[in-house]
């Protein structure tokens, strides 16, 4: 064969050609190998460079927030019962996409497929519902007025939800809608297709409303009065909307009648439609503001907060505001999921209570009072249920935002002066929801932690008034106070529901009064009165069952009794949950149980007993019951507030390491930044604040003590920038999914044996170091001298 040498053949021309070709092949192979090596090296360098860049250029915390966390919820099962709030921290107005009709508490639900508008909302909870809502919805075509008519399909893949910005593609109209907020205003931007019938529908909703189109000013003004209670007769939300281009057509819709060319009028439900002839990709912008005071004030809010500013400018400023506030806690050394969950929960702690005041034409702070309907000077806050938030959400504000805490106290002073009572669940005025007089906890905790700038004497008088009876609704003051003050408990058979829960929460509130009375130098008889009432929790403790139990007027316990029965003597829980509501005297509770060892066994039992429940009080399993049942954690019900502090109570026993184990279990198992990321209602920042505190490594079991009980931090490092600029560095360098136990704690390099850290120590800044281990340190924190505060131990 040509080019092939056979044995015995003399070398010839073909052989020489073969050698040349072989050398060429070898050369090409060397080049190929060198190329592969060079390319691989370049790829490695690029990868390492990218990794280094990723470490040195962190993602902004505002972009780590998933505002959709908790939105996969419904009436029978809550994964948060949240909505994607587009707002500034504690802003007067929020904005949210709407997937259901106004008045449905689940206004945005992750599993829904259609959007009906982007509405201004003030809803603190689906159970309280919304007020003062109106919406904007871009459409094309005629007859797209009502929510059902104008609804458009959308996909989460074409949706961007940030704290500072929301964007969605409305597939039925080929429109992109965007919104970005200020405190009392917002900017909208709509990108339209080519159409002669592009329009924006402004819906003031039913309940009494008005729209007025002013074409020559490219403006719509109006008001809405929709609410679910807690407002005076003259309640209005006045709004103004100014577009950046003239209207090509307009019409009004009033109580079902469409009136082309009409500039609008009043009615039960009014809608304005303003239209444009647009080219594909053409953008139309609108500036929106509102006021609870007047149209003139709404105009002031609009010009003060959006005048001369572009959409991008407002969005960038809102993003920067969130980055500043969220960036005050910087976490490192966790998984991507943990970091995103942390910032998503931290965002939720900065929404409520909302600002309910405005700045008048002279720059003075004024507010419309939802208590008496007057416009008055000073601050006011609303949309908060203290039954939930006294536990951790409010203490987090006190720690991180002392000036805000002072303003909230000023707002409580004004609420009392305007209504005669402290609010317990305000939205915007008094609402008949939940129990207790937990405003006492907020006030005592703030004052005892050094928060000033308000009239504490007025608040003291308000707290004392609470102890004597209830106000215009049963949730204000103390329902059953007469029985409580004379018998030392609210009786089971006196026709007052949730009586054990009331007794326990009143006893803690009395402890708050006792602490504050001593600090204020009140007369000794007052101090002794409240000191005695702090022990009323003992009156509803059954020493045979080692659980809290309803007690009758004659002093006998309720019968029959099941610790699995929800409601009845308790509030959204059962005896397994409420037995631990002795925040101020855990040592006293342990004594009743027969000692600290027995209390540890009872704590264990909550996780060991099956998730049985008796729902006969409600007639069906309320969502809190179902959330407990499905978590596979026995009768532990983290999805509701009464039990959230419970796992920290191991720190009051000879087995403090069990707190560390359980805290990490709850953080890992029951929280995630996804739409189903909570294990129950988020509730105005409370369930989120539990996660934030716990991830940092401590928790305020007893607001009013100035102590935080130590747990198990989630991250290797967290840097907390305090209000005065000092930095608190929380370090746990050995932290991991396996190393969940605390072997040793050092505060500023000095070994600390106690199971708590004080508020004063945190405010000093410095370094709090946790040395972590895979196995528990069964010696640390076991001495009674190292335990957190309890009234009975004399600390």
Regions found by a protein language model. Give the residues of each.
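Sec-dependent signal peptide recognition
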Residues: 33-41
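C-terminal motif of bacterial Sec signal peptides marking the signal peptidase cleavage site
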Residues: 48-50
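ATP-dependent phospho-/nucleotidyl transfer catalytic cores
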Residues: 509
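Accessory carbohydrate-recognition regions in carbohydrate-active enzymes
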Residues: 55-441, 447-504, 512-539, 545-548, ...
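N-terminal secretory signal peptides that target proteins for export/translocation
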Residues: 1-32
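Short aromatic-glycine motifs in intrinsically disordered, low-complexity regions
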Residues: 728-736
């Amino acid at each position: 064969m040509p080019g092939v040498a056979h044995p015995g053949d003399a070398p010839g021309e073909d052989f020489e050609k073969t050698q040349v070709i072989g050398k060429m092949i070898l050369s090409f192979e060397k080049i190929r190998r060198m190329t592969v090596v060079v390319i691989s090296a370049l790829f490695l360098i690029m990868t390492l460079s990218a990794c280094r860049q990723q470490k040195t250029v962190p993602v902004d915390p505002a972009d780590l927030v998933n505002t959709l966390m908790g939105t996969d919820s419904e009436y029978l099962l809550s994964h948060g019962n949240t909505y994607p709030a587009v707002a500034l921290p504690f802003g007067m107005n929020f904005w949210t996409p709407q997937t259901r009709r106004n008045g449905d508490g689940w206004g945005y639900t992750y599993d829904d497929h259609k959007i009906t508008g982007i509405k201004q909302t003030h809803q603190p909870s689906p159970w309280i519902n919304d007020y003062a809502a109106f919406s904007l919805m871009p459409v094309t075509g005629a007859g797209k007025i009502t929510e059902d008519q104008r609804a458009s399909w959308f996909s989460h893949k074409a949706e961007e939800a940030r704290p500072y910005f929301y964007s969605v593609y409305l597939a039925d109209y080929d429109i992109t809608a965007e919104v970005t907020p200020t405190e009392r205003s917002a900017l909208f931007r709509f990108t339209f297709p080519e159409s002669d019938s592009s329009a924006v529908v402004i819906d003031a909703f039913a309940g009494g409303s008005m729209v007025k189109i002013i074409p020559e000013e490219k403006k719509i003004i109006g008001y809405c009065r929709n609410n679910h209670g807690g407002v005076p007769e003259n309640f209005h939300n006045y709004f103004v909307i100014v577009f950046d281009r003239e209207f090509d057509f307009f019409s009004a819709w009033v109580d079902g009648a469409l009136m082309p060319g009409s500039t609008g009028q009043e009615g039960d439900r009014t809608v304005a439609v303003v239209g444009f002839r647009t080219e594909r990709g053409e953008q139309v912008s609108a500036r929106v503001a509102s006021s609870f005071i007047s149209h003139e004030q709404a105009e002031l809010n609009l010009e003060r907060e959006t005048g001369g500013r572009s959409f991008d400018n407002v969005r960038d400023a809102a993003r920067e505001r969130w980055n500043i506030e969220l960036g005050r806690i910087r976490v490192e050394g966790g998984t991507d999921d943990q970091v995103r969950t942390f910032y998503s929960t931290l965002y939720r702690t900065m929404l409520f209570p909302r600002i309910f005041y405005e700045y008048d034409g002279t720059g003075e702070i004024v507010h419309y009072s939802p208590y008496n309907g007057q416009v008055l000077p000073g601050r006011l806050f609303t949309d908060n249920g203290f039954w939930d938030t006294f536990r951790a959400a409010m203490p987090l504000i006190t720690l991180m935002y002392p000036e805000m805490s002072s303003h909230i106290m000023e707002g409580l002073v004004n609420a009392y002066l305007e209504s005669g009572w402290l609010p317990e669940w305000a939205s915007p005025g008094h609402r008949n929801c939940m129990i207790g007089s937990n405003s006492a906890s907020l006030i005592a905790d703030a004052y005892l932690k050094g928060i000033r700038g308000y009239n504490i004497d007025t608040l003291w008088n308000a707290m004392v008034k609470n102890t004597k009876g209830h106000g215009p609704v049963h949730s204000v003051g103390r329902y059953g106070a007469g029985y409580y003050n004379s018998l030392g408990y609210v009786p089971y058979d006196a026709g007052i529901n949730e009586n054990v829960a009331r007794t326990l929460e009143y006893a803690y509130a009395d402890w708050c009064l006792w602490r504050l009375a001593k600090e204020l130098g009140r007369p000794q008889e007052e101090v002794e009165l409240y000191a005695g009432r702090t022990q009323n929790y003992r009156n509803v403790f059954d020493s045979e069952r080692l659980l809290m139990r309803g007690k009758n007027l004659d002093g006998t316990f309720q019968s029959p009794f099941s610790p699995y029965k929800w409601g009845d003597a308790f509030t959204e829980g059962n005896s397994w949950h409420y037995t631990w509501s002795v925040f101020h005297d855990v040592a006293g509770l342990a004594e009743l149980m027969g000692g600290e060892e027995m209390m540890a066994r009872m704590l264990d039992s909550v996780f060991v007993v099956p998730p049985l429940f008796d729902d006969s009080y409600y007639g069906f399993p309320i969502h809190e019951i179902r959330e407990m049942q499905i978590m596979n954690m026995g009768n532990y019900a983290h999805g509701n507030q009464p039990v959230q502090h419970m796992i920290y109570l191991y720190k009051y026993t000879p087995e403090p390491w069990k707190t560390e184990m359980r805290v990490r279990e709850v953080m890992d198992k029951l929280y995630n930044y996804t739409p189903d990321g909570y294990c129950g209602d988020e509730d105005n920042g409370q369930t989120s604040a539990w996660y934030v505190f716990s991830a940092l490594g401590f928790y305020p079991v007893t607001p009013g003590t100035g102590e935080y009980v130590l747990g198990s931090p989630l991250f290797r490092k967290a840097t907390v920038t305090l209000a005065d600029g000092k930095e608190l560095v929380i370090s746990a360098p050995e932290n991991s999914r396996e190393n969940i136990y605390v072997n040793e704690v050092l505060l500023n390099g000095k070994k600390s044996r106690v199971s708590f850290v004080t508020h004063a120590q945190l405010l000093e800044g410095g370094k709090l170091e946790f040395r972590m281990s895979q196995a528990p340190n069964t010696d640390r924190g076991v001495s009674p001298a190292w335990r957190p505060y309890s009234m009975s131990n004399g600390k």
